[in-house]
């Protein structure tokens, strides 16, 4: 009996400042990886599921029931399959927030979700087949395909599907303020406390 090949866990890293092709990885030199724990602290949820059997997968059913994801649809993101591809890809890569969670389950292909950390630096999240990711409401983010130019995803919603992007700046939006208070402010407060402690030690 052969050994089962394990798929890699979802990867994330800090992006460089290069303006080259958005489909490239954009690693810093040297690379700076970000843990799943760090992503969770920013409110980003992740599961690895059985994409080949999504219609009958009990784990997916459990997640949907627990989190109230009652509506689904599907999207193929590729030059061949997506109408108005160039326009939509450009819109996907505009930094924005939503007033609801963004839930995406990658059924095939791969792509990048970029999110901001508490210091406003970009973190690039690389999703593959089987990755299900949830970005919280109010989180600045954007999406890009990678060099494979293909991703098929299930989109999930709580109730009526709403996909209204609010492009940055949206810092006065109530949902953005709530996200800052829940996920960013605790990190910034810790940073301020750490800096104050360091300054006190040098006095």
From Swiss-Prot:
Family matches, as CDD domains: cupin_ARD
Required cofactor(s): Fe(2+); Ni(2+)
GO BP terms, alphabetized: L-methionine salvage from methylthioadenosine; methionine metabolic process
Localization in the cell: Cytoplasm; Nucleus
One example GO MF annotation: acireductone dioxygenase (Ni2+-requiring) activity
InterPro entries in alphabetical order: ARD, ARD_euk, RmlC-like_jellyroll, RmlC_Cupin_sf
Pfam families associated with the record: ARD (PF03079)
Enzyme type, top EC level: oxidoreductase
GO CC, any one term: cytoplasm
Alphabetical UniProt keywords: Amino-acid biosynthesis, Cytoplasm, Dioxygenase, Iron, Metal-binding, Methionine biosynthesis, Nickel, Nucleus, Oxidoreductase
Cofactor note as given: Binds either 1 Fe or Ni cation per monomer. Iron-binding promotes an acireductone dioxygenase reaction producing 2-keto-4-methylthiobutyrate, while nickel-binding promotes an acireductone dioxygenase reaction producing 3-(methylsulfanyl)propanoate.
Catalytic activity: 1,2-dihydroxy-5-(methylsulfanyl)pent-1-en-3-one + O2 = 4-methylsulfanyl-2-oxobutanoate + formate + 2 H(+); 1,2-dihydroxy-5-(methylsulfanyl)pent-1-en-3-one + O2 = 3-(methylsulfanyl)propanoate + CO + formate + 2 H(+)
Coiled coil stretches, renumbered: none
E.C. no: 1.13.11.54, 1.13.11.53
Binding site for Fe(2+): 96, 98, 102, 141
Protein's pathway: Amino-acid biosynthesis; L-methionine biosynthesis via salvage pathway; L-methionine from S-methyl-5-thio-alpha-D-ribose 1-phosphate: step 5/6
Residues given in the record as Ni(2+) binding sites: 96, 98, 102, 141
Tagged with keyword Metal-binding: yes
SUPFAM superfamilies in the cross-refs: RmlC-like cupins
Family membership noted in the UniProt record: Belongs to the acireductone dioxygenase (ARD) family.
Function: Catalyzes 2 different reactions between oxygen and the acireductone 1,2-dihydroxy-3-keto-5-methylthiopentene (DHK-MTPene) depending upon the metal bound in the active site. Fe-containing acireductone dioxygenase (Fe-ARD) produces formate and 2-keto-4-methylthiobutyrate (KMTB), the alpha-ketoacid precursor of methionine in the methionine recycle pathway. Ni-containing acireductone dioxygenase (Ni-ARD) produces methylthiopropionate, carbon monoxide and formate, and does not lie on the methionine recycle pathway.
Protein name: Acireductone dioxygenase 3
Organism: Physcomitrium patens (Spreading-leaved earth moss)
């Amino acid at each position: 009996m052969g050994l089962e090949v394990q798929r890699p866990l979802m990867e994330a890293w800090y992006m460089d400042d290069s303006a080259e092709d958005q489909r490239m990885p954009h690693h810093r030199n040297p690379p700076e990886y970000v843990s799943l724990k760090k992503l969770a602290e920013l409110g980003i949820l992740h599961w690895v599921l059985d994409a080949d059997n999504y219609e009958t997968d009990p784990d997916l059913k459990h997640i949907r029931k627990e989190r109230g994801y009652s509506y689904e649809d599907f999207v193929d993101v590729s030059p061949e399959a997506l109408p108005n591809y160039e326009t939509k890809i450009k819109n996907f890569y505009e930094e924005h927030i939503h007033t609801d969670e963004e839930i995406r389950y990658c059924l095939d292909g791969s792509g990048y979700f970029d999110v901001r950390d508490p210091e406003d630096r970009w973190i690039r999240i690389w999703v593959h087949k089987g990755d299900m990711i949830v970005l919280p409401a109010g989180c600045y983010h954007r999406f890009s395909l990678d060099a494979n130019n293909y991703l098929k995803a299930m989109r999930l919603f709580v109730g009526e599907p709403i996909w209204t992007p609010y492009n940055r700046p949206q810092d006065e939006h109530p949902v953005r303020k709530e996200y800052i208070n829940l996920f960013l402010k605790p990190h910034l407060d810790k940073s301020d406390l750490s800096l104050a402690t360091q300054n006190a030690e040098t006095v």
